[in-house]
Amino acid sequence: MNKMTELAKEYRIPTQATPEDLETRWGKVITFGDRVILVGYYYHPDGNCYFAAVYEFLDDDHTCEGFIGLREVSYKRFEDDGHAIEWALNQN
């Protein structure tokens, strides 16, 4: 199992889904071009509890029902969701 898959399992996020699936389970889901960004909260005692995940569309359907796959998960946790979003937007 690679590090990205391990983090997805730890944060309890799917490796494949639809944007609609993410929106029903997570509060911050942003469609940005051919990517979908998810920002979540995962408690950690050091106080940095926010993480980000970047999904990419796997087909031509870029609606809420399009199929997406996990491309990146932040190894670092952030102090707030804004910094997590910033990280996600900077991923190629």
Give names to the regions the model predicted.
Residues M1-R35:
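Negatively charged, low-complexity tracts enriched in Asp/Glu with abundant Ser/Thr
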Residues I30, I37-V39, Y50-V54, F78-D80, ...:
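Hydrophobic beta-strand residues in large extracellular and virion-surface proteins
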Residues I37-E72:
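Short aromatic-glycine-(Arg/Gly/Cys) micro-motifs in beta-strand/loop hairpins
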Residues T63-R71, R77-N92:
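A short, charged, amphipathic alpha-helix used as a generic interaction element across diverse proteins
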Residues E10, P19, Y42, V54-Y55, ...:
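Short stretches within intrinsically disordered, low-complexity N-terminal or propeptide regions
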Residues T24-W26, A52, R71-S74, A88:
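Residue-level detection of beta-strand scaffold positions
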